[in-house]
């Protein structure tokens, strides 16, 4: 499903829940998709919406994000800074590689995610698991910078 259709589906689901669909809420949904690869925290999301809708309150952004999380459309990825970074839930299972130095979050597509999730659930004796896999380490840029510093 393409981004535009997905956004329309999310807005329709919000409407079905009785939410008023304001220009600000539409901008929040749209910004989650346009800022998505960056895994934004609330602050950049708020700034993006506020540029077009200066009267938007931070509370509106928080409440809309909370609603989208409750609806299962958005979830939080914890960065190295321990801040909540947002991601629109994708249909595929992928991992996140989080750099402990700069905090960047990289999406990593997996070949056999269902097998991996099933194996982890079996070994850990979990009835179910969220479909999020996260690794932490040091990204290539930070590793290079570190090696230059030690030379």
Protein language model features and the residues they cover:
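Basic amphipathic alpha-helical segments that dock to polyanions
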Residues: 61-71
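Short capping segments at the starts of secondary-structure elements
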Residues: 21-23, 35-41
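Non-DNA-binding regulatory cores of transcription-related proteins
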Residues: 70-151
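Short, Lys/Arg-enriched N-terminal segment that forms or immediately precedes the first helix
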Residues: 4-18
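DNA-recognition alpha helix
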Residues: 41-53
